[in-house]
Amino acid sequence: DSNSGNIQWEQEVGELSSGVAAGFGIIVVADVQGNMISLNQDNGSVLWTVNLKGEVLSPPAIDAKFIIVKTGSGELLALDKSNGEILWSYRSKLPALTIRGSSSPVIEGDNVYVTFDNGRLGVFELDSGFPIWDGAISYVRGASELENLIDSDSDPVVEAGVVYTTNYQGNLTLFDIAQKRAIWQSEASSFYSPLLIKGLIILVESKSNLRSFFTKTLEESWTSDEYLNRQLSNPISFSGYTLVGDYEGYIHVIDPLNGKTIGRKKISKKPIKKIISRSKNFYAVDESFNLYSLSI
């Protein structure tokens, strides 16, 4: 229960490899054996299980008819929501070396937007899986395999005809959907999706420094090294503020207009790994999978 934290039901499904996705009456998880498991959202009963022959490291996207999954090997799959049947698939080209992790697909209208470990954005027809267009978030620039890691492990953000993307050792890149091409980029390195708030793009980089850009002019607004090397979590928007967690179990509240910290609270002795915003409350998960419900 989101208000009390009381457990409404439990279901034993084995060791999981991905986070939880929920929507349209179902909950979907993946286990370490490559099984995708669909559960009834009301009572937790197992609706179906299908083996995808590949590890799934990120939550899938759920539509009224489809479940879109990306495997750790770079394969994109569409499953029938009612029975788990594989309806179409697409396999991306993987680089020789990748970071362990994966982005989730995003369904917007009749299209699927997904970023890959080769540093590219792909756009597909939801019904057929037909590739509509793709583009590079960044290109390799180094001489070694480590320098050439350009994985995009962050979900694309689709807003007002623009797709906002990031990757590791690459760029913050904006794509125009109508033009089907990149229209702007700034060198950056991030594991997280950019946050759009109050006319700004806020980015948590891989070393936990923060950067901000105006959405209209794309000029840099402010930068902050206050949290450098504090292993920040993903940023969220809540009550008009930007929130992040860190490796010491703190939640920090930041003014998105100037980057100034206006509050913080220690909620755990473990690193905060994920925070999620939901109406009146926001939720944080620490490294030991403790769940916290908080408000400002």
Model-predicted segments: where are they?
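C-terminal closing repeat unit and adjoining cap/tail of repeat-based domains
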Residues: T217, Y241, D246-N290, I296
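Pro/Ala/Gly-rich low-complexity, hydrophilic intrinsically disordered segments
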Residues: F116, D127-S128, A136-I137, D155, ...
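WD40 beta-propeller blade core
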Residues: I37, L77, G122, T173, ...
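Short loop/turn segments that connect beta-strands within beta-propeller blades
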Residues: D1-S4, N40-G44, D80-G84, E125-G129, ...
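Structural signature of WD-repeat beta-propellers
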Residues: F24, D31-V32, T71-G72, F116-D117, ...
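Extracytoplasmic beta-rich repeat domains
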Residues: I7-F24, V46-D63, I86-G109, W133-A160, ...
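Loop/turn-rich, solvent-exposed surfaces of beta-rich toroidal or solenoidal domains
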Residues: I197-T215, E219-V253
